[in-house]
Amino acid sequence: MNFIKVNNYDELSTKAAALICAQVVMKPNCVLGLATGSSPLGTYEKIAEKCAKGEVDFSKVSSINLDEYVGLDGTNDQSYRYFMNTNLFTKINIDVTKTNVPNGCAADLKAECEAYDALIAQSGGIDLQLLGIGLDGHIG
């Protein structure tokens, strides 16, 4: 584990985006673990800027998100799938079929969680995980 101290949110976003993009350049078919919420928004903006400039290619990348709200489908504007589509996936050249968010509307949530764990294992694990830390101390 490596800790990087930064002076402000913009610097954090720039450094986090650079690390993620470096991972993609180093391993074009990498698996990224992604998070939602306000913490990663700046990072996602910086990634989108780099992608728009042609500095990084996400076409072979897979993503696995942390979580989803139970009872919300991906078209609901409060869902994490909607958040990711709006704030990152539609702004970079990632194959949407390689973006994974748990199904919050699954009939059997335990089976959905087990299938999601299997997906992570079948993907070879997560190469780089992005997490946020909230003001209340939560991580995720």
Region annotations inferred by a language model:
Residues 26-52:
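Glycine-rich N-terminal segment of FAD-binding domains in flavoprotein oxidoreductases
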Residues 136-140:
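Class I SAM-dependent methyltransferase SAM-binding "motif I" and its flanking Rossmann-like core
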